[in-house]
Regions:
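Asp-based, Mg2+/Mn2+-dependent phosphohydrolase catalytic module
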Residues: 1-2, 95-98, 111-218
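Short, flexible loop segments at the rims of nucleotide/cofactor-binding pockets, characterized by
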Residues: 81-85, 107, 176-179
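Conserved catalytic-core motifs of eukaryotic protein kinase domains, centered on the activation segment
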Residues: 17, 108, 117
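N-terminal helical cap/lid subdomain that shapes the substrate entry/recognition surface
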Residues: 1-92, 96-100
Length: 218
């Protein structure tokens, strides 16, 4: 591994509950729709635009407008996103990689403003930020990871990606990158993550693995 690429929501920060609360509340308050577990999981890891377009398609009979829903969603999340704490091991892993001079990238489906707010709020030493809004297709399409590799002039095969969602793992593998899955422990579905190169319980596991490898090469 020469480059480290991280998803953000649910991987670096525990924001999935925040996203879920805001998305479900908007659909319920604006359109009287109660999103089920499977339905919300289907959109996990996808962009905000993809979620809103999906809702407009599924609930056209309720008058769901993708553009209006997206505007309301982004307004609420711009305020709520920094409420999400770092995931266990996130700071330690990122700081260690930074100390080892490993280039670090965030490649997230979230808007760039959200990513910047999180990096600033938590003082993370990450300067290359790639948003899914910069590419035409969202995860599970590999576009956001392909863009990340281009931003740092990296061979995709030399990049290691950390992802918590099935859509993200599929996208990273399609980009030709090595993938470590850190699944959401509240909803474990190990068979869906079988295409990942590794499955870790948390980012502390990843840190321990990398430190052990580093010690063997010294």
């Amino acid at each position: 591994m020469q480059y480290a690429i991280f998803d953000m929501d649910g991987l670096l920060i525990d924001s999935e509950p925040v996203w879920r609360e805001v998305q479900c509340a908007l659909m319920r308050d604006l359109y009287g729709v109660d999103l089920g577990e499977a339905e919300w999981r289907y959109f996990q890891g996808r962009s905000s635009r993809s979620f809103c377009q999906g809702m407009a398609h599924r609930y056209a009979d309720r008058g769901v407008d993708a553009g209006a829903l997206l505007d309301r969603l982004l307004d609420r999340m711009q305020v709520a996103i920094t409420d999400a704490p770092l995931m266990p091991g996130a700071r330690e892993l990122v700081d260690w990689l930074h100390e080892q001079d490993v280039p670090i990238v965030i490649a997230s489906s979230s808007p760039l403003g959200f990513i910047e707010a999180v990096v600033e709020h938590h003082a993370l030493p990450i300067r290359v930020l790639v948003s899914g809004t910069e590419v035409p297709r969202s995860k599970p399409h590999p576009a956001v990871f392909e863009r990340a590799a281009k931003r740092i002039a990296a061979d995709p095969s030399r990049c290691r990606v950390w992802e918590d969602s099935v859509n993200g793992v599929i996208a990273a593998r399609a980009a030709g990158m090595v993938v470590t899955a850190v699944p959401d422990t509240n909803h474990p579905t190990p068979q869906q993550f079988s295409i990942a190169d590794q499955i870790h319980l948390n980012l502390y596991d990843s840190l321990a693995e990398l430190q052990a490898k580093s010690a063997r090469t010294e």
